[in-house]
Amino acid sequence: MEYNAGKKEINLDRNLSSLDELVLKFIRIIEKHSDYVIISGYVSILLGRSRATEDVDLFIENISFEKFVDLYEELKKNGFWCLNAEKAEEIYSFLKDGMAVRFSVENKPIPNFEVKFPKREIDKETFNDSVLVSLSKAKAKLKISSLERQIAFNRYYLKS
């Protein structure tokens, strides 16, 4: 792993896990419709920590209902479903009300993607200081929250 703090980039040259491949499939759809930042536990897994997870948390920008419908239709077309609701109006309403919604591969609730709009100013800032992770073997990139933000979140919010 190489970290360039000035460029806010990490280069990973490792084989992908099945979770990594699923994340890439999901994110390739998300990034066509919205900016995003992966946050929380999967970040440490991506960077080499060996632990299990049931979900991958991410913020997406606060997009319009029309853009969300396009995103949701593409997710469904690619085999994902929403665990919270089926109708786009309902799912979007959850997001607008500050709640997270979960998507997974159809009929496989785990692992899933917990998607949310940023609520607080500190959530919105994750987009400004995100780090780009290059997965060289997959020729792909993922945006994660900054390492400093990850540490602060774990220490002060989760108390771990």
Task: Map each language-model feature to its residues.
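Compositionally biased terminal segments of proteins
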Residues: M1-S160
